[in-house]
A protein has these predicted regions:
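Tandem repeat scaffolds
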Residues: 1-145
Length: 145
C-alpha cells in the first residue's frame, strides 16, 4: 500500500490489496483506507478503526470483536459471516453493505448508523445484548420495534 499525508497525519491506503487472514488485533488504524481491498478472515479485534474506510471491501469472515468502528464507511462492503460482537459502530455508514449470513452482532452499538430499512429489519431479527463500552442496548441502538 501507499501512504499520504492528510491534515498533517499519515494515512495508509491499501486500495485493491489482498489482505486475507491478516492480524490487525489491537492496532490503531484510525482513518486507514481499505477500500476495494480483499480482507477476508482478517482479525480486527479491539482495533481502533474510527473513520476507516472499507468502501466496497470484501470483509467476509473477518472479526471485529470489541473494535472501535465509529464513523466507519462500510458502503457496499461484504460483511458475510463477519463477527461484530461488542463493536461500536456509532454513526457508521453502511448503505449497500452485504449482511447476508451476518449473525454475530450481540452487544454491538448501532447508534445513528446509516443503513437501509431491510438491513435494519434483518439485524433486528438477531439483535441482543448491550455494548460493553458504551452501555447501549443493541436492539435500542437499531431502533427495533
Amino acid at each position: 500500500g501507499a501512504s499520504t499525508l492528510q491534515g498533517g497525519r499519515r494515512i495508509t491506503i491499501t486500495r485493491g490489496v489482498n489482505l486475507d487472514n491478516t492480524n490487525w488485533a489491537g492496532e490503531n488504524l484510525k482513518g486507514v483506507a481499505f477500500q476495494q481491498s480483499v480482507v477476508r478472515s482478517a482479525n480486527f479485534e479491539k482495533a481502533n478503526l474510527r473513520t476507516a474506510s472499507f468502501f466496497d471491501a470484501d470483509l467476509a469472515g473477518s472479526k471485529f470483536n470489541d473494535a472501535n468502528m465509529k464513523l466507519v464507511n462500510l458502503e457496499m462492503a461484504d460483511l458475510s459471516n463477519a463477527d461484530l460482537r461488542g463493536a461500536d459502530l456509532t454513526q457508521a455508514y453502511m448503505a449497500g453493505a452485504v449482511i447476508k449470513d451476518l449473525k454475530l452482532i450481540a452487544d454491538t452499538d448501532w447508534t445513528d448508523v446509516d443503513m437501509r430499512k431491510d438491513q435494519r429489519s434483518a439485524l433486528c431479527a438477531i439483535a441482543a445484548g448491550k455494548n460493553p463500552r458504551t452501555g447501549v442496548d443493541t436492539r435500542e441502538s437499531l431502533m427495533c420495534p
